[in-house]
């Protein structure tokens, strides 16, 4: 929230008993260099909106408070009601109070006018996370039959400045629904993700657009490219699962084999990458980790040169799945699982040593014959 803005005052003083002297004339402004002229032009452009005629930025020196505008004289502002005994009351700036007092007034009146529409822009500039303002703006967009493409340009600029704001992404989604035109979306989202590839607001919007408008083509190639750039990006692994689950699925043996081998290759590049291990477990666990042909042998082959806590924990899961499915050499498999739990507790994942010892005790109590369980367990 903006802080309260103080207003400084100054007075010219002279010597005691002497008449006040007029201030000296101001020096002439220095000639603007080309760069300064360009900056001044940009500042002038920023003060006016390409969407709302007559809109002035709140930072403009010519901005006038709503209470001082003749065209708003018919409105009684509605102050915020914090109750009789507010605790830790927010100190709003004068502009903030003024804008939102008038916004509450037009909201109560359900005033669907051009001036109310312009007011929402000021309110959004002060707090773009206020969902009530966005909702009322959408009501006005429909009632005033505004150009939705202009509104798309407006929301694009705001998202570029505030890419992690729930309300701005929801507003964009509604506009895309109204326009029934996703043609700008994937490129726009890719641009946002190029700045922060883990922005879950952008990923959520991308998934909605792809699913709503059936834009599955080339998405897996896009995911491949992002994983080449950052194989640790859990958001991209999640997108890979989303795309395949909604297209080919994993029931096709060829697809599953491709994904298993793809993931193992990514693991070889970065063995300590938990995201890849989670993906591998996610695509196999419904069918049973121990039932995938040759997976155990491939993991054991990785262990000497690519060992990590995640590999060992995955092996524990595989052995547990084998025990659950009544394997022939149950005692041997149990001992291997218990040995790995101890390695994790003592060497590879000591911060969670008590967890791994708990897993070991649970495996013993579930899969040991009662007479075989050590007295200390």
Curated annotation (Swiss-Prot):
<feature type="repeat" description="PFTA 2">
    <location>
        <begin position="147"/>
        <end position="181"/>
    </location>
</feature>
<feature type="modified residue" description="N-acetylalanine">
    <location>
        <position position="2"/>
    </location>
</feature>
<dbReference type="GO" id="GO:0035022">
    <property type="term" value="P:positive regulation of Rac protein signal transduction"/>
</dbReference>
<dbReference type="GO" id="GO:0005875">
    <property type="term" value="C:microtubule associated complex"/>
</dbReference>
<dbReference type="GO" id="GO:0007167">
    <property type="term" value="P:enzyme-linked receptor protein signaling pathway"/>
</dbReference>
<comment type="similarity">
    <text>Belongs to the protein prenyltransferase subunit alpha family.</text>
</comment>
<protein>
    <recommendedName>
        <fullName>Protein farnesyltransferase/geranylgeranyltransferase type-1 subunit alpha</fullName>
        <ecNumber>2.5.1.58</ecNumber>
        <ecNumber>2.5.1.59</ecNumber>
    </recommendedName>
</protein>
<dbReference type="InterPro" id="IPR002088">
    <property type="entry name" value="Prenyl_trans_a"/>
</dbReference>
<dbReference type="GO" id="GO:0005953">
    <property type="term" value="C:CAAX-protein geranylgeranyltransferase complex"/>
</dbReference>
<dbReference type="GO" id="GO:0008017">
    <property type="term" value="F:microtubule binding"/>
</dbReference>
<feature type="region of interest" description="Disordered">
    <location>
        <begin position="1"/>
        <end position="55"/>
    </location>
</feature>
<dbReference type="Pfam" id="PF01239">
    <property type="entry name" value="PPTA"/>
</dbReference>
<feature type="repeat" description="PFTA 4">
    <location>
        <begin position="215"/>
        <end position="249"/>
    </location>
</feature>
<dbReference type="GO" id="GO:0005965">
    <property type="term" value="C:protein farnesyltransferase complex"/>
</dbReference>
<keyword id="KW-0808">Transferase</keyword>
<dbReference type="GO" id="GO:1904395">
    <property type="term" value="P:positive regulation of skeletal muscle acetylcholine-gated channel clustering"/>
</dbReference>
<feature type="repeat" description="PFTA 1">
    <location>
        <begin position="112"/>
        <end position="146"/>
    </location>
</feature>
<feature type="repeat" description="PFTA 5">
    <location>
        <begin position="255"/>
        <end position="289"/>
    </location>
</feature>
<comment type="function">
    <text>Essential subunit of both the farnesyltransferase and the geranylgeranyltransferase complex. Contributes to the transfer of a farnesyl or geranylgeranyl moiety from farnesyl or geranylgeranyl diphosphate to a cysteine at the fourth position from the C-terminus of several proteins having the C-terminal sequence Cys-aliphatic-aliphatic-X. May positively regulate neuromuscular junction development downstream of MUSK via its function in RAC1 prenylation and activation.</text>
</comment>
<dbReference type="GO" id="GO:0004663">
    <property type="term" value="F:Rab geranylgeranyltransferase activity"/>
</dbReference>
<dbReference type="GO" id="GO:0004660">
    <property type="term" value="F:protein farnesyltransferase activity"/>
</dbReference>
<feature type="repeat" description="PFTA 3">
    <location>
        <begin position="182"/>
        <end position="214"/>
    </location>
</feature>
<keyword id="KW-0460">Magnesium</keyword>
<dbReference type="GO" id="GO:0018344">
    <property type="term" value="P:protein geranylgeranylation"/>
</dbReference>
<dbReference type="GO" id="GO:0004661">
    <property type="term" value="F:protein geranylgeranyltransferase activity"/>
</dbReference>
<dbReference type="GO" id="GO:0060632">
    <property type="term" value="P:regulation of microtubule-based movement"/>
</dbReference>
<dbReference type="GO" id="GO:0004662">
    <property type="term" value="F:CAAX-protein geranylgeranyltransferase activity"/>
</dbReference>
<keyword id="KW-0637">Prenyltransferase</keyword>
<keyword id="KW-0007">Acetylation</keyword>
<dbReference type="GO" id="GO:0043014">
    <property type="term" value="F:alpha-tubulin binding"/>
</dbReference>
<dbReference type="GO" id="GO:0030971">
    <property type="term" value="F:receptor tyrosine kinase binding"/>
</dbReference>
<keyword id="KW-0597">Phosphoprotein</keyword>
<dbReference type="GO" id="GO:0018343">
    <property type="term" value="P:protein farnesylation"/>
</dbReference>
<keyword id="KW-0677">Repeat</keyword>
<dbReference type="GO" id="GO:0010698">
    <property type="term" value="F:acetyltransferase activator activity"/>
</dbReference>
<comment type="subunit">
    <text>Heterodimer of FNTA and FNTB (farnesyltransferase). Heterodimer of FNTA and PGGT1B (geranylgeranyltransferase).</text>
</comment>
<feature type="compositionally biased region" description="Pro residues">
    <location>
        <begin position="19"/>
        <end position="32"/>
    </location>
</feature>
